[in-house]
């Protein structure tokens, strides 16, 4: 019985390690800070990935610039090729002897100068195209947006149009032009323009009447002017009217 009791006690107080503890390798369970080191490594990896993505984005942004420069270079190269071809053609024309057989020395010189001028103009045109220079000037170069811009634009347009005011077709041209440019306006805007033209018409009528009145005052008096006035004065002497008047007329 005693032996059985000892065996019982031994079985009862045997310490059994938990299954989870036995599965954990030795030395790992005691390191409480190991997980934090792993998290730091993960964070470092994320930072590296973000930096790599930023570098890739920067490279992608730079690619269009490179391709754009390449396109510009190709365009310039193509223009130079065309210009070179034109210059060769001009050179052939300058050196062609058969073209000058029937020309006088003066005509040959004039032809050479003309071809030289064409070559210079061609070179200038190439330079303008290369650097993106716009040939537009004056009205064509304007793009009005503010009130001052439209005022300046109107001045230039007026100078351009009024140089043809002596033409017989000028009035009909303006009539059609005003109608066409006003066709898209609102009623209120059309009324303003109509009122402005009405006022202008009234002013022109007043000026015309004043001008006609001045011409009448400066005109010749009916009946002979000064001569008729002197004749009337002599007629006031009664009986001497016929004789003196006749002598006066003969004298005049």
Swiss-Prot record:
Q: Where is the composition biased (Basic and acidic residues)?
A: 57-107
List the GO cellular component terms.
eukaryotic 43S preinitiation complex; eukaryotic 48S preinitiation complex; eukaryotic translation initiation factor 3 complex
Q: Which domain of life is it from?
A: Eukaryota
Coiled-coil spans in chain: 65-130
Provide the residue span(s) of the region labelled Disordered: 24-107, 209-232
- Extent of Acidic residues compositional bias: 36-56
Primary location recorded for the protein, binned into one broad class = cytoplasm
Q: Which GO terms describe its biological process?
A: formation of cytoplasmic translation initiation complex
* Keywords, ordered alphabetically: Coiled coil, Cytoplasm, Initiation factor, Protein biosynthesis
GO MF terms here are:
translation initiation factor activity
Write down the InterPro entries for this protein, in alphabetical order. Answer: eIF3-like_dom_sf, eIF3j
Q: Does the keyword Cytoplasm apply?
A: yes
Q: Give the UniProt subcellular location, in the record's own words.
A: Cytoplasm
Under the subunit heading, UniProt states:
Component of the eukaryotic translation initiation factor 3 (eIF-3) complex, which is composed of 13 subunits: EIF3A, EIF3B, EIF3C, EIF3D, EIF3E, EIF3F, EIF3G, EIF3H, EIF3I, EIF3J, EIF3K, EIF3L and EIF3M.
User: In UniProt terms, what function does this protein have?
Assistant: Component of the eukaryotic translation initiation factor 3 (eIF-3) complex, which is involved in protein synthesis of a specialized repertoire of mRNAs and, together with other initiation factors, stimulates binding of mRNA and methionyl-tRNAi to the 40S ribosome. The eIF-3 complex specifically targets and initiates translation of a subset of mRNAs involved in cell proliferation.
Task: Give the family from UniProt.
Answer: Belongs to the eIF-3 subunit J family.
Supply the name of the protein.
Answer: Eukaryotic translation initiation factor 3 subunit J
Organism of this sequence:
Gallus gallus (Chicken)
């Amino acid at each position: 019985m005693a032996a059985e009791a000892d065996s019982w006690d031994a079985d009862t107080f045997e310490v059994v390690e938990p299954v989870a503890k036995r599965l954990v390798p030795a030395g790992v369970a005691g390191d409480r800070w190991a997980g934090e080191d792993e998290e730091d490594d993960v964070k470092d990896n994320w930072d590296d990935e973000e930096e790599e993505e930023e570098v890739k984005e920067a490279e992608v942004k730079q690619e269009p610039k490179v391709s754009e420069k390449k396109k510009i270079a190709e365009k310039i190269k193509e223009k130079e090729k065309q210009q070179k071809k034109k210059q060769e053609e001009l050179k052939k024309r300058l050196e062609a002897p058969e073209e000058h057989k029937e020309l006088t020395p003066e005509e040959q010189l004039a032809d050479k100068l003309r071809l030289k001028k064409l070559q210079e103009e061609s070179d200038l045109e190439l330079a303008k195209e290369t650097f993106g220079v716009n040939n537009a000037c004056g009205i064509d170069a304007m793009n009005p947006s503010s009130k001052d811009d439209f005022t300046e634009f109107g001045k230039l347009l007026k100078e351009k149009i009024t140089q043809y005011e002596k033409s017989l077709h000028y009035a009909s041209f303006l009539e059609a032009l005003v109608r066409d440019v006003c066709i898209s306006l609102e009623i209120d805007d059309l009324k303003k323009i109509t009122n402005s033209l009405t006022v202008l018409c009234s002013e022109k009528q007043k000026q015309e009447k004043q001008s006609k009145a001045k011409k009448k005052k400066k005109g010749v008096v009916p009946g002979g002017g000064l001569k008729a006035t002197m004749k009337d004065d002599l007629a006031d002497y009664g009986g001497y009217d016929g004789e003196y008047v006749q002598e006066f007329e003969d004298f005049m």
